[in-house]
């Protein structure tokens, strides 16, 4: 049914079902309101005066049909605007109200006031705020600080054909190359330069220390939204707009650099265990990659993401996709990762379809004639990257891009299961932030949104600038094309390399604990599993807690203190015997042992021999009985059921032989 919603900023029309709740109504309403609206102040009423107004959080669980609303009814909405919206992306600080009013879920739906944020990101629709002297106030990662101190020059040996100088001399043929040298990258078949090499390239053109000019941050993030607080003095958007506050036309080009150059999985077992649910059910699976960033020497000034664990959040797996549920313990998992020296580095999901040959091969769906990354997947990954910005002192906003990576497991052209790694470009992330693009039914095409709503009214929440892209036409000329209504998705992502180490040295060495949220395949995390890992009933001094999922489960038990949890994570990652003995002597660890001893460890089932199963019954008769034929191969069936079958057989005389 169609509901009309009248508010201070005009009339809106929403399409709902009677079984939909007011929470669903709020998810449709909030994106259509001005971005400065505080969702906590939204109220609904049947009267224009608002005498019986109810807050959205109070009626979020009620169905629309329960209130007597029908097709075409009019409801009145009131709300308040935030006094000031702060961006703060450089230092990672944001007020709670601004985050609530501007953050969407991973699937694009707005977050209601009564719901918790999955993580605490900077606002996605906040104004673009510049930071004064970011090189003094912004705290980078230790890896970026180390790479900033390196010159990144590529050494070359003496050319015996061209060099005419002595062994201690140097000329143009043997002098070190810059890390962004195009010829060197082409020879080494490096498609994209690293972000630190790109920084060296643009910094050499932006700042000239020899001229004595003031320093200008060379990195600039794209900004495709209407700027707030325009100095021209006109009313704020959407009441007014001018050339100073409106975004310029967008010209898309392939991004020449990438924030992360390589994705390294600590062991092949990480991927193998992640694929087990698909092998058992044929449904897809999604997981969050936890690891760390290290230097990557294959690419000049390169960075690689080392994956140590995959955590699978609550989800509903289907054959053609995944539906994410609320991840209630995300903060606990991130805290365990932090204590282990890890952080979320990416996301991974499967897109597999069994070839039906019985050899484990998969159908190749992603290739040059179809697509490599679908438009819907690009928008999903771009939102994740927007929630994990990278702080840097080389940008005037204190941030630039994101190190968050995206991995897809699918079948290749040889029918093998392979991994592909990607990152969304900075233009793609900002276009998703600004609500300029949306997925299309064609996975290889991205749509440019229209400013008009479905009812023909002009949108009050987004401004769509002109979008173009450059390509090589059939005559070999570099031409500019209009991106409306759709353009190829290849302009929105870059590819990464991936692999496994030659000598694996994983942080977590024990893979015997069940993985969370796998109850649908019969893999559940229980206290008995912890008792088995810790060998509680065996009274052993040796125990192996080096498992990420085990650490997360122990934290959920809320037995250990913060210091004891930090010590436990240190034992799991550093494998120090001194720390292990110190952990065993703590009060929390002894309490955990007492709980596990009271819970108990399940004893293994007693094996049975076939000779002792039916000592006094004719086996030739039992072998022809349909019940025994069905249970003949089930050796782990309880003995009581098998003897019950024997008693039933003894009460029934054998059938007479057929007449000859």
UniProtKB/Swiss-Prot annotation:
Presence of the UniProt keyword Endoplasmic reticulum in the record: yes
Any one GO BP annotation for this protein: ubiquitin-dependent protein catabolic process
Record localization: Cytoplasm, Perinuclear region; Endoplasmic reticulum membrane; Nucleus membrane
Domain of life assignment: Eukaryota
GO CC annotation terms, alphabetical: endoplasmic reticulum membrane; nuclear membrane; nucleus; perinuclear region of cytoplasm
Function: Involved in the import of nuclear-targeted proteins into the nucleus and the export of poly(A) RNA out of the nucleus. Has a role in the endoplasmic reticulum-associated degradation (ERAD) pathway.
Family: Belongs to the NPL4 family.
The protein, known as: Nuclear protein localization protein 4
Organism of provenance: Neurospora crassa (strain ATCC 24698 / 74-OR23-1A / CBS 708.71 / DSM 1257 / FGSC 987)
């Amino acid at each position: 049914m169609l509901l009309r919603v009248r508010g201070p900023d005009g009339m809106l029309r929403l399409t709902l079902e009677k079984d939909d709740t007011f929470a669903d109504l709020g998810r449709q309403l909030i994106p259509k309101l001005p971005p400065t609206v505080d969702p906590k102040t939204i109220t609904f009423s049947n009267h224009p005066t608002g005498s019986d107004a109810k807050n959205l959080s109070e009626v979020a669980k009620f169905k629309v049909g329960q209130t007597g609303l029908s097709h075409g009814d009019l409801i009145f909405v009131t709300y308040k605007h935030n006094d000031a919206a702060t961006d703060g992306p450089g230092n990672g600080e944001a007020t709670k109200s601004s985050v609530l009013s501007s953050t969407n879920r991973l699937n694009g739906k707005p977050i209601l006031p009564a719901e918790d944020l999955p993580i605490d990101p900077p606002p996605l629709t906040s104004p673009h705020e510049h930071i004064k002297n970011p090189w003094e106030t912004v705290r980078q990662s230790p890896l970026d600080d180390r790479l900033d101190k390196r010159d990144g020059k590529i050494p070359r040996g003496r050319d015996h054909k061209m060099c005419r100088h002595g062994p201690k001399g140097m000329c143009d043929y043997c002098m070190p190359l810059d890390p962004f040298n195009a010829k060197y990258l082409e020879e080494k078949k490096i498609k994209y330069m690293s972000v630190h090499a790109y920084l060296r390239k643009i910094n050499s053109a932006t700042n000239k220390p020899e001229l004595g000019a003031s320093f200008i941050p060379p990195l600039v993030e794209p900004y495709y939204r209407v700027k707030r607080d325009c100095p021209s003095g006109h009313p704020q958007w959407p009441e007014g707009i001018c050339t100073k506050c409106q975004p310029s036309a967008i010209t898309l080009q392939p991004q020449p650099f990438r924030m992360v150059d390589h994705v390294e999985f600590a062991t092949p077992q990480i991927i193998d265990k992640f694929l087990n649910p698909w092998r058992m059910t044929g449904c897809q699976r999604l997981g969050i990659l936890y690891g760390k960033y290290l230097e990557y020497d294959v690419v000049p000034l390169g960075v690689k993401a080392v994956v140590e664990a995959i955590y699978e959040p609550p989800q509903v797996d289907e054959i053609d996709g995944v539906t994410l549920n609320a991840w209630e313990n995300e903060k606990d998992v991130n805290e365990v990762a932090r204590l282990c020296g890890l952080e979320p580095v990416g996301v991974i999901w499967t897109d597999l379809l069994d070839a039906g040959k019985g050899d484990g091969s998969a159908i190749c769906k992603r290739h040059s004639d179809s697509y490599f990354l679908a438009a819907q997947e690009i928008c999903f990954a771009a939102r994740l990257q927007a929630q994990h910005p990278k702080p840097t002192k080389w940008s005037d906003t204190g941030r630039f891009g994101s190190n968050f990576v995206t991995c897809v497991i699918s079948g290749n052209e040889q029918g093998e299961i392979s991994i592909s790694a990607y990152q969304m470009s900075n233009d793609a992330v900002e276009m998703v932030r600004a609500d300029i693009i949306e997925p299309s039914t064609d996975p290889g095409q991205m749509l440019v949104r229209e400013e008009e709503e479905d009812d023909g009214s002009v949108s009050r929440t987004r401004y769509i600038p002109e979008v173009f892209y450059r390509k090589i036409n059939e005559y070999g000329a570099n031409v500019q094309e209009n991106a409306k209504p759709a353009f190829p998705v290849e302009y929105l992502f870059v590819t990464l390399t991936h692999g496994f180490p030659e000598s694996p040295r994983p942080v977590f060495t024990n893979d015997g604990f069940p993985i969370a949220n796998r109850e649908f395949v019969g893999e559940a995390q229980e206290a008995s599993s912890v008792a088995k890992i810790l060998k509680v009933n065996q009274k052993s001094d040796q125990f192996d807690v080096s498992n990420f999922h085990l650490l997360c489960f122990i934290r959920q038990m809320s037995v250990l203190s913060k210091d004891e949890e930090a010590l436990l994570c240190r034992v799991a990652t550093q494998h120090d015997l001194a720390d292990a003995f110190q952990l065993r002597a703590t009060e929390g660890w002894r309490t955990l042992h007492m709980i596990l001893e009271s819970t108990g460890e399940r004893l293994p089932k007693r094996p049975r021999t076939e000779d002792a199963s039916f000592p006094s019954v004719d086996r030739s008769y039992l072998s022809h009985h349909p019940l025994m034929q069905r249970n003949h191969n089930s050796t782990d069936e309880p003995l009581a059921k098998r003897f019950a079958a024997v008693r039933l057989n003894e009460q029934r005389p054998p059938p007479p032989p057929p007449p000859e």
